[in-house]
Amino acid sequence: MTKMRESEIIRMFIEEFDNHALGDDAGFVRFNDSWLLVTSDMLVWRTDVPDFMTPEEAGKKVVTMNVSDIAAMGGLPLAFFFSLGVPENTDEKTLRGIAKGINKGAKEYGVKIVSGDTNEAREIIIDGGAIGRGSRLLLRSNAKPGDLVCVTGELGRPLTALLLWLKGEEIPPKILEKAKNPKAREREGIELSNYANSAIDISDGLSKELWEIARSSNVRIVIDEDKIPVNEEVREIVKDPIKIALASGEEFELVFTIPKENLGNISFDFTIIGRVEEGEGVYIKREDKMERLPILGWEHLKGGDYVNL
């Protein structure tokens, strides 16, 4: 059994590859006067699909996961492809539901399903991929001192839904809807490509994503606890809503850093939660105290758990 975390495995592979530029939400190669973006993201039934989610919702989620990666790079999603691992005892209803969900997601985001593969597996695995195009890329490594740190949407619902489900408690409809049917911010990503310096999607938790930007850009990020956009229902349900908002993964909201003078050009709703400074690390301001922010969020291969939660 491996003793390495998911993030450690990723870093190890990047070290072995000649292309050390890997590490963003999507890979990219120059294609004429634009960038060709390619990403892949996998959904494994045992770890990624709680029983409150239908096969159709799971199929659509795989498309969302991959489109979100393209959006975080500031790209226009164009195509979706996937490989499907299927146990031999899987019923047709489940497979048909997955197929309908993939098609529904492709229609919603305006991407074409261009390729697929199927093989036998011990459990259902959907390994999705997306192709996109961008003119100006949003990289995790391009945050600049003086940038403001912003986030789209409200945070906390997916993790709240998961924790309630694990405890066997009823999940309020609006909390459940975000967990079952997340949305990629593809339009926002395209707009941000003109004005922001860096971006990342919240797939593993706000805390982890902020650390990714800080490390990749060699900067210090300071956020204000009072400015984190926690969903109101989450505040009413959980004991520590800020911690939940910082750790909640599969939000697929965008975190971005942007020069202050460019804020007026943004047409969608967002929340300013902090700033980028010279230095290193991620810090959170709580009342009059400044604390180093722990890395909270989902981590595969350590029991599949939310680390430090």
Swiss-Prot record:
The remark listed among the other comments is:
Reaction mechanism of ThiL seems to utilize a direct, inline transfer of the gamma-phosphate of ATP to TMP rather than a phosphorylated enzyme intermediate.
Which residues of the sequence carry a binding annotation for Mg(2+) 2?
Answer: D41, D69
Pathway where this protein functions: Cofactor biosynthesis; thiamine diphosphate biosynthesis; thiamine diphosphate from thiamine phosphate: step 1/1
The entry sums up its family as follows: Belongs to the thiamine-monophosphate kinase family.
Q: Which GO terms describe its biological process?
A: thiamine biosynthetic process; thiamine diphosphate biosynthetic process
**Gene3D superfamilies per the UniProt record, alphabetical:** PurM-like C-terminal domain, PurM-like, N-terminal domain
Residues binding ATP, per UniProt:
G116, D117, R140, S203
- Membrane-spanning ranges: none
What keywords would UniProt list here? ATP-binding, Kinase, Magnesium, Metal-binding, Nucleotide-binding, Thiamine biosynthesis, Transferase
Note the Pfam families from the entry: AIRS (PF00586), AIRS_C (PF02769)
The protein here is known as: Thiamine-monophosphate kinase
- Alphabetized CDD domains for the sequence: ThiL (cd02194)
Q: Where does Mg(2+) 3 bind?
A: D25, D69, D201
Stated role? Catalyzes the ATP-dependent phosphorylation of thiamine-monophosphate (TMP) to form thiamine-pyrophosphate (TPP), the active form of vitamin B1.
> Which positions bind Mg(2+) 1?
S40, D41, D117
Record NCBIfam families: PRK05731.2-2 (NF004353), thiL (TIGR01379)
InterPro entries according to UniProt: PurM-like_C_dom (IPR010918), PurM-like_C_sf (IPR036676), PurM-like_N (IPR016188), PurM-like_N_sf (IPR036921), ThiL-like (IPR006283)
Q: What class of enzyme is it?
A: transferase
Q: Which organism is it from?
A: Pyrococcus horikoshii (strain ATCC 700860 / DSM 12428 / JCM 9974 / NBRC 100139 / OT-3)
Reactions this protein catalyses: thiamine phosphate + ATP = thiamine diphosphate + ADP
The parts of the chain that form a coiled coil are none
- Residue numbers binding Mg(2+) 5: D204
Q: Which E.C. number(s) belong to this protein?
A: 2.7.4.16
